[in-house]
Regions:
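Low-complexity, Ser/Thr/Pro/Gly-rich disordered linker/stalk regions
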Residues: 41-157, 161, 165-168, 290-333
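Short, Lys/Arg-enriched N-terminal segments with co-localized hydrophobic residues
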Residues: 2-19
Length: 333
């Protein structure tokens, strides 16, 4: 449900994908993040790039790990226990995170999240990783692999494959809540059809009863395979890119208010499990993640920065200072 009215819409194009971009829409959404869209006039900023990566505040992780302990040493938390989001009664399980060789480029490794269900809450296992809460304005990017079907078992569960930044959920409708989402729903959900991709920027939220104040844009069509996701957060505007193409621009009251953590998760929508017997497993792969503080980099600049660090055999770099005092960084939302 939402309030507002679309006057008319126009189409943007990704290869094989159609994007509907309404030109005017009231921007307060309730219950599900499916109805609000960017304001008219998507634009690209004037950019200012530092003279070298060494002078910048950067997070880069190539996920070239062998164990979870190596990953947590570099500031990551692998979630355990239960809680939002996902199926009520499901469990977030650290052993769902694994690392494997991927020869593109040569000698590369990646992180894999595997989530599974048999249609019951007690046998539903979800996955989430979180980095420290110290990121605000600048550029966020990740190279991820989405999938349209489970790797085993029957298809149809409403699974959500993500890359996002977020503040902790402290209280309902907190004024300093912030969240920026990429969410791929190959089997639909939240009232959408199959193969729906959302980018959503949040002002605030209340979990129970559900009250979500956000603005969201959607893409229809398969995004199975590898994609580079880039978010620019500067000058009061949030811009979302997929594979170099600008697909949405949000701002105004939805612009982030507070430092966020960087997260990935793979979870199932509550009430969206197929009620058939048998285990099914879904996967999302992550090649790398990148953040440049304070500066809007274009996707090609991000790719160049990542390529440069790889040529220098840099597997991990974190020169983004923690806040003083350090902010609490729960991995539970």
């Amino acid at each position: 449900m939402f309030s507002g009215a679309v006057l008319y819409s126009e189409k943007l194009q990704l290869p094989g994908i159609e994007i509907m971009k309404p030109i005017f829409l009231a921007v307060f959404c309730i219950l599900v993040p499916v109805s609000c869209t960017p304001s008219a006039g998507i634009s690209v900023p004037n950019l200012s790039t530092p003279s070298s990566l060494e002078e910048s505040q950067i997070l880069f992780d190539d996920f070239s790990y062998s164990t979870i302990d190596e990953m947590t040493y570099n500031g990551w938390v692998v979630r355990s226990g239960s809680g939002w989001p996902g199926v009520t009664g499901a469990t977030f399980r650290p052993e769902n995170v694994s690392f494997l060789d991927y020869p593109d480029p040569a000698d590369n490794r990646l992180l894999r999240m595997t989530s599974s269900t048999d249609g019951t809450a007690e046998n539903t296992y979800q996955t989430q990783i979180c980095h420290q809460r110290k990121y605000m304005e600048g550029t966020y990017a990740a190279r991820v692999r989405f999938s349209d079907q489970p790797v085993s078992g029957v298809d149809g569960d409403q699974v959500v494959q993500t890359f996002y930044t977020i503040t902790p959920y402290i209280e309902p409708l907190a004024p300093d809540y912030s969240e920026l989402d990429y969410e791929y729903l190959p089997n639909g959900g939240w009232g959408s059809g199959d193969l729906t991709f959302y980018v959503t920027t949040w002002e605030t939220v209340q979990i129970e009863p559900r009250n979500a104040d956000n603005t969201s844009s959607s893409v229809q069509g398969s995004l199975a395979g590898w994609h580079t996701l880039v978010t620019q957060v500067t000058g009061g505007t949030v811009r979302y890119f997929v594979d170099g193409q600008l697909i949405a621009q949000h701002g105004g009251e939805y612009y982030p208010d507070a430092p966020m953590s960087i997260n990935f998760n793979l979870w199932f929508i509550d009430g969206g499990l197929v009620q058939v017997e048998g285990l099914r497993e879904y996967q999302e792969d992550i090649d790398w993640v990148f953040h440049q503080a304070g500066i809007a980099l274009m996707p090609e600049e991000v790719e160049a920065a990542v390529a440069r660090m790889r040529r220098q055999s840099i597997k991990f770099r974190d020169t983004v200072p923690a806040k003083v005092p350090a902010l609490v960084s729960p991995c539970n939302f």
